Regions:
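Alpha-helix N-cap/helix-start motif
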Residues: 30, 81-83, 114
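Hydrophobic ligand-binding cavity/cleft-lining segments
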Residues: 1-41, 150
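Short aromatic-glycine motifs in intrinsically disordered, low-complexity regions
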Residues: 44-51
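Short acidic/glycine-enriched loop/turn segments that link adjacent beta-strands
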Residues: 42-44, 67
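Hydrophobic-ligand binding "helix-grip"
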Residues: 36, 51-100, 106-110, 138-139
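A conserved amphipathic terminal alpha-helix motif
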Residues: 100, 106-150
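Hydrophobic pocket/interface hotspot
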Residues: 17-21, 27, 46, 60, ...
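A structural signal for well-ordered alpha-helical scaffolds and beta->alpha junctions
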Residues: 14, 53, 122-125
Length: 150
């Protein structure tokens, strides 16, 4: 099983960040490479358009508004992976001085090495979190890791 994860400091409260990213259909306002998102199945499935005209279909697996977190799986995508499960969460920092946003996923690489698949999502998560932080203030730190677990 392969994995990728990223974390970034954002200089505003967790509640403010969650207002922007906490909806399962809320990617286009903050994620530049997803210009369009439409939901089906009562909002539990989202169909994402990417700039190349491709479609990614994702299913909401778990949503916890109080914890500011949701998990989703990929149903259909042009990526070399299977059994993808990701979580996005927002955590208030102690003292109320901003928040941490975490985005992580586990998956099985298909037709490529675990490292290659991890790099794909590592870049996606890093770029996405940088774009998110830029909406509020310059980012102070991006910590990113990608791991392959045999």
């Amino acid at each position: 099983m392969a994995q990728a994860s990223a974390c970034i400091d954002v200089a505003v409260s967790a509640d403010i960040v969650w207002q922007l990213i906490g909806g399962f259909n809320s990617l286009p306002p903050w994620l530049p490479y997803i210009p369009k998102s439409e939901t089906t199945e009562g909002g539990r499935v989202r169909h994402l358009a990417n700039p190349n005209g491709g479609t990614i279909v994702e299913r909401l697996e778990k949503f916890d508004n109080a914890a500011r977190s949701y998990s989703y799986s990929i149903i259909q995508a042009p990526f070399p992976i299977a059994d993808y499960l990701a979580t996005i969460s927002v955590h208030q920092k102690a003292g109320g001085s901003g928040c941490l946003v975490d985005w992580s996923a586990t998956f099985i690489a298909k037709g490529v090495s675990d490292s290659e698949a991890s790099k794909l999502f590592q870049g996606t998560f890093e770029d996405g979190l940088k774009a998110l932080a830029a909406r509020f203030a310059p980012s102070r730190r991006v910590g990113l890791s990608a791991h392959s677990v045999q």
